[in-house]
Regions:
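Conserved active-site tyrosine of GNAT-family acetyltransferases
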Residues: 78-82
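Short, cationic low-complexity segments
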Residues: 115-124
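Conserved GNAT acetyl-CoA-binding A-motif
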Residues: 60-72
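Conserved acetyl-CoA binding element of GNAT-fold acetyltransferases
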Residues: 31-42, 69
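Conserved acetyl-CoA-binding loop-helix of GNAT-fold acetyltransferases
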Residues: 40, 46-59
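Acetyl-CoA-dependent GNAT
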Residues: 1-32, 36, 123
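Conserved short alpha-helix immediately C-terminal to the canonical SAM/SAH-binding motif I
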Residues: 53, 74-77
């Protein structure tokens, strides 16, 4: 599996495993991977490529946790991933079309807030 950076989009990558299987957009700051968008092409969804992508991100990148939000259409997938990787679901959202946020692996909200406040001084 490999990621290929898109030409004109910052932090966006195509996901390849011999052939293109999806698209991902993420940003890493202070060892926190902020997942913006993950799409697996429908014909590859039941072949565990979503799990493989998350495992790839955790192993290849120097990150402590993944932070993201759950779309209504992908709640089942994220529920399984949160349980599998000992994550936590948080009932706060930033976007209108999401149901909840998540942190994988589990990290105290206070610790995450401290990391984010170092990045964004306006949170204080």
């Amino acid at each position: 599996m490999r990621l290929q950076k898109k030409k004109y989009y910052n932090h966006s990558y195509d996901i390849y495993d011999g052939k293109k299987i999806g698209t991902i957009t993420f940003q890493i700051k202070h060892r926190i991977l902020s997942l913006k968008y993950l799409e697996i092409i429908p014909e590859y969804r039941n072949q565990r490529y979503g799990e493989k992508v998350i495992d790839y991100l955790l192993s290849k990148n120097n990150v402590d946790c993944i932070v993201g939000e759950t779309l209504k259409s992908s709640r089942g997938f994220w529920h399984k991933e949160i349980k599998r990787l000992n994550g936590v679901r948080v009932n706060t959202t930033y976007c209108d079309n999401t149901t909840s946020a998540f942190i994988i692996p589990k990290m105290k909200i206070d610790d995450l807030y401290e990391c984010l406040s170092e990045i964004y001084h306006m949170l204080d």
